[in-house]
């Protein structure tokens, strides 16, 4: 890691929190992909996939919640910049072998800073929404493995999580 990457950019010289000034950075295409999952009982996963939970269509509600969360990240994470997102999507993939529902969010913008936090927030809120809608039938659910998978654009360039 270079010395520049070892600095905590959200702290000033006195150690106080600050929002990073991105005013001099070029506007470039940015993209981030994040993933996470909700592990649950096999019966709960079946209820979700069959659309038979009492609270309604879990995946539709969680998808909208994740997209809304991406758009509101700057209100939730104190030092994040408000970004004009051009794309936000949330996808779900059942993994019966792990009794899990995989969540993937992709976020894009033309901007001066990345959209990693927006993608991570989308996954997190989608997972929490799934938990909320299913907790009456499964209190053992576990949210885990929320992580950045890839980012594209910006001064630091492209990055892909090693497999």
From Swiss-Prot:
InterPro entries: MoaC, MoaC_bact/euk, MoaC_sf, MoCo_biosynth_MoaA/MoaC, Mopterin_CF_biosynth-C_dom. Disulfide bonds: none annotated. Keywords: Lyase, Molybdenum cofactor biosynthesis. It catalyses: (8S)-3',8-cyclo-7,8-dihydroguanosine 5'-triphosphate = cyclic pyranopterin phosphate + diphosphate. It is an enzyme of class 4 (lyase). Catalyzes the conversion of (8S)-3',8-cyclo-7,8-dihydroguanosine 5'-triphosphate to cyclic pyranopterin monophosphate (cPMP). This is Cyclic pyranopterin monophosphate synthase. It comes from Chloroflexus aurantiacus (strain ATCC 29366 / DSM 635 / J-10-fl).
């Amino acid at each position: 890691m270079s010395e520049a990457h070892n600095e905590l950019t959200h702290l000033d010289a006195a150690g106080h929190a600050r929002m990073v000034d991105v005013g001099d950075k070029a506007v470039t295409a940015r993209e981030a992909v994040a993933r996470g999952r909700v592990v649950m009982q096999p019966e709960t996963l079946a209820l979700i996939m069959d659309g038979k939970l009492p609270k309604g269509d879990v995946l539709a509600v969680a998808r909208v919640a994740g997209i809304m969360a991406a758009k509101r990240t700057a209100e939730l994470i104190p030092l994040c910049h408000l970004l004009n997102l051009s794309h936000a999507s949330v996808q779900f993939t059942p993994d019966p072998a792990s009794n899990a529902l995989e969540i993937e969010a992709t976020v894009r913008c033309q901007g001066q800073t990345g959209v990693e936090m927006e993608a991570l927030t989308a996954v997190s809120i989608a997972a929490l929404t799934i938990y909320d809608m299913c907790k009456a039938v499964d209190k053992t659910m576990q949210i885990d493995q929320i992580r950045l998978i890839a980012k594209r654009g910006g001064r630091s360039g492209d990055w892909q999580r090693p497999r």
